[in-house]
Amino acid sequence: FDIQHPKEGRVDQGICYQYADLHNHETLNAIQDEFSDKHVVFGMAFPVCTDLSVAGSSRFKSKAEKNPSFQTEAVSYAMWCAKLFNSMHIPYFVENPVSVLATKWRKPDHYFHPYEYGGYIRDDDAEHPRWPEYIAPRDAYKKKTCLWTGNGFVMPTKVAVDPEAYHGNGYSTQMMKLGGKSQRTKDIRSATPRGFAKAVCDANINKGET
């Protein structure tokens, strides 16, 4: 569910993408009602990091002037997701970069960098299928990411690859090539690392099966 998805929905590689305004309480209640009696095995939530990440703290003041409750709403959404997953008795994670969730909600349960799970990506599948010019092969880049977890979530074993070296200015290749505030830039920077996603699936859903 995401507000970016088309209203008519779409299916790609077995994944159903549905439009939803996840900051609308009626929408959230409808989702909860729809899935409360279905066989759901795992939950993942990705609160809007631009409203929470400490990397964007310089813009918090201007955002608050436009909407004084912008951050409260973002934190409430993260907490609502955890509450939903708890009510369904399924393992879950709520993901964000280093952010104010640690102080306005609770401390993260786990931290990771994408390269620490790059070993789950095969050599013949090393290049990112959508953004190979920006995302390093086999997720070989650093980006400290926090996880708030529950209901028996298993943090997968790390199988790391060597991370790409930073440039002289301290930026990764991805950060060097990406700039601005476009939605595309935000999507690339916030893309869930493929290796980590596979590792989580293996540890929590497939239970080691391949």
Where are these regions (language model features)?
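Adenosine-cofactor binding site in Rossmann-like domains, unifying the SAM/SAH pocket
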Residues: 1-35, 109-114
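Short glycine-rich, polar/acidic loop-and-turn segments at beta strand-coil junctions
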Residues: 4-5, 47-49
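A conserved beta-strand element that flanks and buttresses the S-adenosyl-L-methionine
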Residues: 44
